[in-house]
Regions:
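C-terminal and inter-domain tail/linker signature
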Residues: 1-187
Length: 187
């Protein structure tokens, strides 16, 4: 993401995918990813570059869908089982979730839950409890939404099972860049 002031870039945010570099170099020190490791393709609709003009109303509507989905997802595990997330309300049943290196790809809601969400929440069940200490910014344009935050997640690593990281009982912060494509009201 780039921040512009007076037609100049004043800030640039990027995540260096060091795990991917380590994998390419054959120096991966952790257990294999739970999901499939491979490149992240462009959007299935092949319309990832959105020409102008900017449609603010559509962009705001798309952002709101993502915010509603994230709000529902944060209900679990503190407010009940997986059903409180209402994932079928927001996610297409055949969606693809492309995680970073070390996590991998999940196909469909069950793939996302099995290969990323369940291990992640088991290891850090206090997800979503420190919203007053995080920052995030949403961007929406037509059917695409992105969010970045530095940090936008704070959790405590209390259990094992996620990327082979030992449960040290330490709070960790995470920076992320997440992108979503919406089709017919579903992610």
């Amino acid at each position: 993401f780039y921040q512009f002031e007076e037609n100049r870039v004043v800030e640039f945010q990027a995540l260096w995918d060091l795990p991917e570099v380590m994998m390419q170099a054959g120096a991966w020190p952790m257990p294999p990813s739970l999901g499939r490791e491979w490149h992240v393709p462009g959007p299935a609709t092949q319309d990832g570059l959105v020409p102008g003009p900017y449609d603010e109303e559509h962009g705001l509507k798309s952002c709101q869908l993502i915010i509603d989905m994230l709000t529902a997802m944060k209900r679990h595990p503190s407010q009940g089982g997986p059903e409180v997330m209402e994932m079928e309300k927001y996610w297409h049943p055949r969606m693809s979730w492309y995680g970073p290196s070390g996590i991998g790809t999940g196909r469909g809601i069950s793939g996302f839950r099995n290969w990323h969400q369940i291990p992640f929440l088991n290891a850090m069940p206090d997800r979503g409890q420190y919203v007053d200490q995080i920052n995030y910014h949403f961007f929406g344009d037509r059917n695409y939404v992105a969010v970045t935050g530095w940090p936008n997640m704070i959790q405590t690593l209390t259990h094992d099972g996620w990327m082979g990281i030992a449960p040290a009982g330490k709070r960790v912060t995470m920076r992320s860049l997440d992108f979503w494509r919406i089709e017919k009201g579903l992610i």
